[in-house]
Structure formats: structure tokens, C-alpha cells
Amino acid sequence: MLTVDYDRLGLEPGDRLLDLGCGAGRHAFEALRRGARVVAFDYDEGELKDVAGMTAAMASEGQVPAAGGSACVRGDATRLPYPDASFDRIIAAEVLEHIPADDAAIAELSRVLRPGGTMAVTVPAWLAERVCWALSDEYHAPAVPGGHVRIYRESGLRSQMRSAGLQPRGSHHAHGIHSPYWWLKCTVGPTNDDNPLVRAYHSVLVWDIAGTRPWSHLTRLADRVLSPVIGKSIVVYARKPHSTVTPSAVTARPTVTGEANAS
């Protein structure tokens, strides 16, 4: 299940791509299949271990083009361990809403993106997220450690990106059929996965993600119709202009552990 449109991002074989807050690796895997040199970056060691295992398996099965490669790196999004202009493309999918100092994270992303490079930032869309917060205090911080700490409006996110020296260049909503699922979960309890309605709806989402026919045709049609209205995520694409003056680099760097599975 991808949130970012790689064609709009402009990803090409051999591009250096940072997947910030890579999580389970969905965007990193697709970028690797397209021949990018991917850094999957996250704070969660367990998820990074799983991502490293998957990328190694992809390489051994011949799913990685010659131009591609990957590394898994643990670190702090507000103190990235890379020189200025290290990456051609950046994806930050569903991560900024977890970071208290999101301006610092956006500034770091701008710093490590090369002039002329592009970035895709995705966060929960305002309407879908507002309903979730209204339905359940268990859905967000402080009730959930590491949970969502804010709700974004697209205009505010664009303003933050401009302040970091980036030029927003377009946006779209995604995952329209996922919003009702999360509203249902928030109604019965975000951790109540045994609820019959939640389990039934989850099966529908699995059909959609797996492309199970004929149901996936219906779910994907529904998603295209619903996403502009109640999409769970908003994606904003931006470019770093050649003349930009990026925020000063953070001088201190975290201790970072990395695992490269291809080069």
C-alpha cells in the first residue's frame, strides 16, 4: 500500500533516496525495486531489522536492479547524520505527526536534500484525523506513547515547508477507504481488533492491498472516489530550489547504527 506517487516524486534509477520514518518499509521496498539507492531510516530497531531482512531477500531474489542498493539506519529525525545535499529524493510518510519538534525535522530534511531534489511528505489529513481525535482519546498522545501529537492542515504544512526553504509543488489525498476503518476502530476502541465489524472491514482492506479479485476492483474504485473527500492521508510534494539557503546544519550528531544489505 503506497501513499506516495513515485512519478510525481520524480524517482529515477540510481537516485539517492531517504525514507524517513520508514516503518515496515513499504516505500523503501518500492523505491528499491525501481533501482534507487535507498536509506531506510527509523528510530525503531525492531522494524529496521525486519526491513533489512526483506531488502536482503529482495536482493538475493534478483528484485533489485543494478543501480539500486539499500542501507538501514537508526537515528533521530531532528539530527540527521548526513552532510548537506546528500539525497536526490526524500520520503517522509506518516512520521511528522509523531515528532514534537516537527519544524526541526523539516529543516533537517531540507538540509540533506540536494538543490533541485524533490520530497514527498505525507501526514494524516485534517478531516479524517479530527474525527479520530474526537472519537477516542486512546488514539493519540499523550494517552498513546509515541502517538500523534498534532493535527495538520495542508496550508500549515506547506507553510512549514516554505520556511525550511522548500517549494511545495502539488498535493493529493490518499486512502479514502481507510478513514471509515479508523473511525470504526476509534468508536469501539483503537486496540479492539477482535470486534466483528473491525475484523470484517480489515478483511476488505486486505483484499484491496493484496489485489484480490474481484473485490479489489470495487475497493480501488471506492478509494478513488472517496480519497479526495475523506482520504486518510494528505501528500505534499516539494522541490528544493537551486538558490535556496537552507537552515544551518545541526552540529551535534546522534550515535547511529547502520546495516547495509546491498551497495
Model region roles, listed by residue range:
Residues M1-P83, R89-A93, D103-I106, V149, ...:
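Conserved N-terminal segment of class I S-adenosyl-L-methionine
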Residues V38, M119-A120:
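A short hydrophobic/small-residue beta-strand
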Residues E45, I99-D103, V123, L127:
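A structural helix-start
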Residues A93-L96, T122:
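Residues lining the SAM
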Residues D103-T118:
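A short glycine-rich, Lys/Arg-flanked "PGG" loop and its adjoining helix->strand segment in the class I
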Residues A120-H148:
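Conserved class I S-adenosyl-L-methionine
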Residues H148-A164:
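Short alpha-helix
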Residues G170-V206, K232-S233:
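Conserved catalytic loop of SAM-dependent methyltransferase domains
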